[in-house]
């Protein structure tokens, strides 16, 4: 059984989304897999924090765009724990999982040579690659 890490930033007004996120993902996302929720929050308490799979981590709320720019630095505060997981996902706070998503249809299948899982943001659907927001500055380390 794979162990899935769920990264979730739950600061400021976004705390309102956490209960439904937890309930729908616990029920529908990768049934049969062990899920560990890493909740970065400034709230004094959150729903479901008594669940041993919910790891509440104190986190200062940042205004946008700083919250996005510092996201990976925030996650790396838990690097040791995250290294123990088989798969790691970050989800936007307002996402819900309305239908069952099985490991067979979602996770890579190593026996078939699959090693990575990629998800495309809906904003890129039906766009020509020249309109993707990739960094095209050859001096940038994020250059594509």
Label every PLM stretch briefly.
Residues 96-137:
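Conserved donor-nucleotide/metal-binding helix-loop-beta segment in metal-dependent transferases, i.e.
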Residues 49-62, 74, 105-109, 113-115:
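Active-site regions of enzymes building and remodeling cell-envelope glycoconjugates
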Residues 4, 86-88, 117:
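Generic beta-sheet signal
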Residues 67-75:
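Glycine-rich, basic loop-to-helix element that forms the pyrophosphate-binding segment
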Residues 8-10, 39-42, 91-93, 99, ...:
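Short His-Asn-centered micro-motif
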